[in-house]
C-alpha cells in the first residue's frame, strides 16, 4: 500500500517499505476553539531498505490548507464568475536526515524508524471535507531526497475532529416548538437533544390535538436543511462584500397518519395524535457536513416541518415550524479517507449514541496519568486536620462575646433561667478558658481583669449588667454556647486543640460591647475631637492615686464592687450633672427594654 504513493524514481529494490504510521488515526478536540485543551500528535516514519540508498535528506512535513470557493450561476449578474482563496494555515517540518547543502549520504540496508511528536493547540481549525471546492485539510508528506533520481514521496491525510464535551448543553437540552392555532390545532414538535451525531438518526416527537370538529390532518413533511455561509476574507471588516450563502436539503421525510388507528387520548384531556419519526442522516460527508464556523466557513442545520390541515369547509391550511439542530462528528464512528463512515451498520450508530449518553466528565481517557489518591499527602485535604481543634474557634475569633443587654429579656422569658444568669455563666465559662494553664483564686482573677480594664482606660463595671439584674440562684445548672467537646480542655490531648494566643484576654476585653443602659449614660465625644496623641496615651498608663470620693459617688457605684476599687476618668463622666439616665424611673426602664426588643425583632 505504501509503495503506491511513490512518484517516479524510487524502485522497490531501493525502498522496500516507506510509510507514515500515526499512533491515533485522528486528533480530537473537545469543546470550542476558545475552551478546548491541547492534543498530542505522535507517530513514526518507517523505512525499510533491501540495499544501500544514496539520499540527500529525509523530511516529514505537516501542512494545513484552507480553501474557500464558490461559483455564481451564469444567469446571475456575475455571469458565472468564480471566487476563491486558498491559504496555508499550519506548517511543521521534521528533518530526520540532512547531511548538508549539496551533500549526500549512503543509508545501509536495514529497517529505520523515525519517531515524531507534536502538541497541537486547542484553537486549531477542524477538518472540513465534503464540498467540492471549499475545505480545510491537513496532510502529511514524507520525502526522501535523492541527487540523481526523483524523490521518493509518500502522503497521508490527518483528520482533526472537534466534538462536543459530555457536559455540553446541546446534549442535555431538548428542543421543542409548542403553540395553539386558535380554532384549528394545538401542536407540539420536539427533539430529545439539539446535538445529533453524524451518521445516526434524528428522533422527532409530534403531538397534534385538533380543536375544530371535522378537522383532519393531512401530509406531514419533515426536512433537514443545511446552510453554507462562505467568506473570502473573514479577518477583513469589509468582508461583507465577499460572502456567499447557499442552502441544500439533506433529507426529506413525508408521512400520513392512519386516522382510524392513530387517534388516542393525550394527557387524559383531549383526543389527538402522538407519534415519533426517525430521520436517518447520510453516512458520507459529501452529502452532509458537520456544524462548524471557522476560517470563513460556516455550516448550520435546521429542521423544517409542514403539516397539512384539512378544514371541514374543504380548504387546506398548512402549519409550519422550524427547530435548530447541531450535527457533530463522534470519535467513536470512524471516517475513512473518502469521507465515508467505516461502519455503517445501525448497531455502530447505536453504540456511538450510548457512549455519548453514558459519558460523565471527567473522561477517564483524559486522566490516565493523574496521581492516585493513595499517593496524596492527606495534610491539607482532610478537615479537621491533626493539628486542628475539635470544636469551633475560641472567643478571640468569634462575636458571641458581645455582652448585650440580656437583662432586658428577663421580663419576656418563660423559662426558669433568666437571661442575666445565662450571660453570667457564659462569662464565667470564658474566664475559665482564659486561665486554663493554672487555676488562680477568684480574687486573683478579678484583680487581673480590673488591672486590664484600668490599662485600657475602661471602668470595671462598664460591661456589666445593670444593678439588680445579677440576681440568680447559684445552684442553677451551667449552660454553654460552645460544643461539649470544647468546654473541658483539661482532658484534650496535647496538640489536638487550637493553641491559645497570648493576647487573648486583651482582645476579649476590647471586643466586648457595653449594655444599652451603660452606653446611654456615657458622654458622647464631640465630632471635632481628635485622636489622643502619644503623650496622652503614655500618661494614661501611669498609675493615678485614688482621688477623694464622696459618699454620693460611692453610693452610685455598683453595690457588688468593693470601695477599694479605683475610679478612672470614665467613671467620673458617668456622674456629671447633665446625665440623668441612671436616675430614670422603673417605667422608663420598661419602655426602653420594650423598644430594644422591638428593634431586635425588626433586625
Swiss-Prot record:
The keyword Lipoprotein does not apply. One of its GO terms (cellular component) is cytosol. GO terms for molecular function: protein-macromolecule adaptor activity; ubiquitin protein ligase binding. It holds the Pfam family Arrestin_N. Residues 465-481 have a biased composition (Low complexity). The keyword Aminoacyl-tRNA synthetase does not apply. GO terms for biological process: regulation of protein ubiquitination; ubiquitin-dependent endocytosis. Keywords: Ubl conjugation pathway. Residues 443-455, 482-492 have a biased composition (Basic and acidic residues). Residues 375-398, 432-499 are annotated as: Disordered. Belongs to the arrestin family. Interacts with hulA. Component of the regulatory network controlling carbon source utilization through ubiquitination and deubiquitination involving creA, creB, creC, creD and acrB. May be involved in signaling by recognizing appropriately phosphorylated substrates via its arrestin domains and then recruit a HECT-type ubiquitin ligase such as hulA, leading to ubiquitination of the substrate, providing a link between ubiquitination and phosphorylation in protein regulation and stability. This is Probable HECT-type ubiquitin ligase-interacting protein creD. It comes from Aspergillus flavus (strain ATCC 200026 / FGSC A1120 / IAM 13836 / NRRL 3357 / JCM 12722 / SRRC 167). The lineage of its organism: Eukaryota, Fungi, Dikarya, Ascomycota, Pezizomycotina.
Amino acid at each position: 500500500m505504501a509503495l503506491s504513493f511513490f512518484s517516479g524514481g524510487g524502485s522497490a529494490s531501493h525502498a522496500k517499505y516507506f510509510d507514515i504510521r500515526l499512533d491515533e488515526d485522528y486528533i480530537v478536540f473537545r469543546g470550542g476553539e476558545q475552551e478546548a485543551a491541547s492534543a498530542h500528535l505522535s507517530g513514526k516514519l518507517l523505512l525499510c531498505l533491501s540495499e544501500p540508498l544514496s539520499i540527500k535528506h529525509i523530511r516529514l512535513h505537516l501542512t494545513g490548507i484552507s480553501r474557500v470557493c464558490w461559483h455564481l450561476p451564469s444567469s446571475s449578474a456575475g455571469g458565472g464568475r468564480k471566487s476563491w482563496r486558498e491559504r496555508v494555515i499550519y506548517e511543521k517540518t521534521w528533518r530526520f536526515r540532512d547531511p548538508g547543502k549539496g551533500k549526500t549520504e549512503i543509508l545501509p540496508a536495514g529497517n529505520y524508524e523515525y519517531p515524531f511528536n507534536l502538541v497541537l493547540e486547542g484553537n486549531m481549525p477542524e477538518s472540513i471535507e465534503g464540498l467540492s471546492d471549499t475545505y480545510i485539510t491537513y496532510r502529511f508528506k514524507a520525502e526522501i531526497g535523492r541527487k540523481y533520481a526523483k524523490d521518493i514521496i509518500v502522503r497521508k491525510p490527518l483528520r482533526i475532529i472537534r466534538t462536543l464535551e459530555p457536559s455540553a448543553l446541546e446534549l442535555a437540552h431538548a428542543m421543542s416548538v409548542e403553540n395553539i392555532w386558535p380554532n384549528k390545532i394545538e401542536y407540539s414538535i420536539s427533539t430529545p437533544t439539539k446535538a445529533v451525531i453524524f451518521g445516526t438518526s434524528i428522533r422527532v416527537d409530534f403531538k397534534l390535538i385538533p380543536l375544530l370538529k371535522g378537522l383532519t390532518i393531512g401530509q406531514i413533511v419533515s426536512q433537514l436543511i443545511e446552510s453554507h455561509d462562505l467568506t473570502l476574507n473573514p479577518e477583513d471588516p469589509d468582508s461583507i462584500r465577499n460572502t456567499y450563502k447557499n442552502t441544500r436539503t439533506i433529507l426529506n421525510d413525508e408521512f400520513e397518519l392512519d386516522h382510524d388507528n392513530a387517534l388516542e387520548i393525550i394527557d387524559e384531556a383531549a383526543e389527538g395524535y402522538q407519534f415519533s419519526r426517525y430521520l436517518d442522516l447520510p453516512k458520507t460527508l459529501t452529502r452532509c457536513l458537520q456544524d462548524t464556523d471557522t476560517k470563513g466557513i460556516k455550516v448550520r442545520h435546521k429542521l423544517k416541518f409542514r403539516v397539512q390541515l384539512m378544514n371541514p369547509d374543504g380548504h387546506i391550511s398548512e402549519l409550519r415550524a422550524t427547530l435548530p439542530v447541531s450535527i457533530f462528528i463522534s470519535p467513536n464512528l470512524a471516517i475513512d479517507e473518502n469521507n465515508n463512515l467505516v461502519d455503517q451498520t445501525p448497531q455502530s450508530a447505536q453504540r456511538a449514541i450510548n457512549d455519548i449518553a453514558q459519558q460523565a466528565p471527567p473522561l477517564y481517557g483524559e486522566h490516565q496519568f493523574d496521581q492516585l489518591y493513595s499517593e496524596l499527602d492527606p495534610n491539607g485535604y482532610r478537615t479537621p486536620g491533626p493539628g486542628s481543634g475539635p470544636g469551633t474557634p475560641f472567643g478571640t475569633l468569634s462575636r458571641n462575646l458581645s455582652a448585650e443587654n440580656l437583662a432586658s429579656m428577663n421580663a419576656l422569658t418563660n423559662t426558669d433561667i433568666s437571661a442575666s444568669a445565662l450571660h453570667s455563666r457564659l462569662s464565667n465559662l470564658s474566664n475559665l478558658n482564659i486561665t486554663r494553664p493554672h487555676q488562680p483564686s477568684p480574687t486573683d482573677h478579678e484583680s487581673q481583669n480590673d488591672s486590664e480594664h484600668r490599662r485600657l482606660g475602661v471602668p470595671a463595671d462598664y460591661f456589666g449588667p445593670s444593678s439588680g439584674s445579677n440576681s440568680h440562684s447559684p445552684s442553677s445548672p451551667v449552660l454553654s454556647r460552645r460544643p461539649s467537646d470544647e468546654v473541658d480542655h483539661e482532658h484534650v490531648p496535647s496538640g489536638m486543640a487550637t493553641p491559645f494566643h497570648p493576647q487573648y484576654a486583651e482582645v476579649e476585653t476590647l471586643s466586648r460591647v457595653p449594655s444599652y443602659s451603660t452606653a446611654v449614660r456615657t458622654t458622647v465625644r464631640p465630632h471635632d475631637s481628635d485622636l489622643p496623641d502619644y503623650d496622652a496615651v503614655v500618661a494614661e498608663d501611669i498609675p493615678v492615686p485614688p482621688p477623694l470620693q464622696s459618699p454620693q459617688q460611692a453610693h452610685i457605684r455598683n453595690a457588688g464592687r468593693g470601695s477599694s476599687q479605683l475610679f478612672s476618668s470614665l467613671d467620673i463622666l458617668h456622674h456629671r450633672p447633665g446625665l440623668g439616665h441612671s436616675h430614670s424611673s422603673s417605667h422608663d426602664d420598661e419602655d426602653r427594654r420594650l423598644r430594644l426588643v422591638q428593634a431586635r425583632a425588626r433586625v
